[in-house]
Amino acid sequence: MKKTSLNVVAAALALLALGAGATMALRFDVHKRKAPAATALFAQTFSDADGRMQPINQWQGGVLVVTFWATWCAPCIEEMPDLQEVQAEYATRGVTIVGVAIDNASAVKRFRDEQNIGLPLLIAGAAGTELIRQLGNPSGALPYTVLVGRS
């Protein structure tokens, strides 16, 4: 009798987990968001900290890691040296890490120069928050990292 009760509880938990997973998939529309999100990302052009315009699609075709960050975001600042190390380790494998700042150019340039950051740092300003939402972060919270594969 105990074995039957345990099986019923296990089956109920499995169904609950399946239902929760299906609800999350429908709520966040993960599969439908992939292609339009990548298209939206690669359609962007931002200036870098030196004022040069940089289209995101210049990195299309490789593995692209885009981290949305700001100089006023403590976790963002904390992860920047780690991202730079990852870039150095995986650059020969076609991986590029790009920082897109929800910030202003002077703050980003000062941070880059003081911290000796060699990653491409682009300036989206407040408009970048809408892009973050399109890429699957409805709250616009930072830091937010997006990984785009080769295809």
Predicted regions and their residues:
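C-type cytochrome heme c attachment motif
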Residues: 71-78, 143-144
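Conserved hydrophobic/aromatic "anchor" residues
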Residues: 44, 68-69, 111, 119
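Thiol/disulfide oxidoreductase modules built on the thioredoxin-like
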Residues: 8, 111-119, 124-151
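N-terminal targeting signals for export/organelle localization
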Residues: 1-47
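Short active-site neighborhood of thiol/selenol oxidoreductases, capturing the structured segment around
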Residues: 54-74, 83
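Active-site acidic short loop of glycosyltransferases
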Residues: 59-62, 92, 118, 140
